[in-house]
Design a protein with these regions (language model features):
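Short amphipathic alpha-helical segment with a characteristic S/N-K-E followed by hydrophobic residues
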Residues: 15, 52-58, 67
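Basic, helix-initiating cap at the start of DNA-binding domains
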Residues: 1-25, 29-38
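The DNA-contacting recognition helix of HTH DNA-binding domains
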Residues: 12, 43-44, 54
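Short, basic, alpha-helical segments at the C-terminal edge of helix-turn-helix-like DNA-binding modules
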Residues: 32, 62-69
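Hydrophobic/aromatic-rich alpha-helical bundle segments in the mid-to-C-terminal region
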Residues: 105, 135-172
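Short secondary-structure transition hinges
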Residues: 94-128
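Short hydrophobic/aromatic patch on the recognition helix
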Residues: 39-50
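Hydrophobic alpha-helical connector segments
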Residues: 59, 70-98, 150-153
Length: 172
């Protein structure tokens, strides 16, 4: 990789990480100027690399979801007891849900929908493996099918994604 390509890649990673840190503001409240300031790049660089605010947000969301899949894989492979893993998984899911308002934002983007579908394809086997670990440890009854557990888990996640998510604010 030549120097220009490497610097471009590093700058894009910085922009996407800065955007990820701003996702809690809500997509409508994120401004290119805020991303540029946080990433310490010019707004022009962002437009040159991505073309629009929508595209930088989608790229950042894709980076975030890929990072979270990796974290999920690491969590499942740890030696901690199943119940602790479950608690961390639920916390992980709650944090992820906060970023899922991008669904409504990009529901017309077929490439993004394909990306979300591929994420589901990656995470489903992880969840099945997690279920199997729970059965092996005796924390999940053997007679409950993986399909049933996946159905309920998906139903819970779907219901959470359709709930309005309040922005965190200081309470006096």
């Amino acid at each position: 990789m030549n120097g220009f390509t490497r610097r471009t890649k590093e700058k894009m990673e910085t922009i996407e990480e800065a955007t990820i840190s701003l996702l809690d503001l809500g997509i409508d409240n994120i401004k290119i100027a805020d991303i540029a300031a946080k990433a310490m790049v010019s707004q022009v660089s962002i437009y040159n690399y991505y073309g629009s605010k929508d595209k930088v947000i989608k790229a950042a969301f894709e980076r975030l979801m890929n990072n979270q899949i990796q974290c999920l894989e690491k969590l499942i492979e740890t030696d901690m007891p199943f119940k602790e893993k479950l608690e961390q998984l639920l916390t992980f899911k709650k944090q992820t849900i906060n970023h899922l308002n991008i669904y409504k934002y990009s529901s017309q983007d077929t490439q993004f929908i394909q990306f979300l579908s591929s994420l589901y394809s990656k995470s489903s086997p992880l969840f099945i493996r997690f279920i199997q670990m729970g059965k092996k440890s005796g924390d999940i009854r053997e007679n409950v099918s993986d399909t049933t557990l996946m159905f309920y888990f998906d139903m819970i996640v779907q219901s959470l994604t359709h709930l309005p998510i309040p922005h965190t604010s200081a309470v006096n």
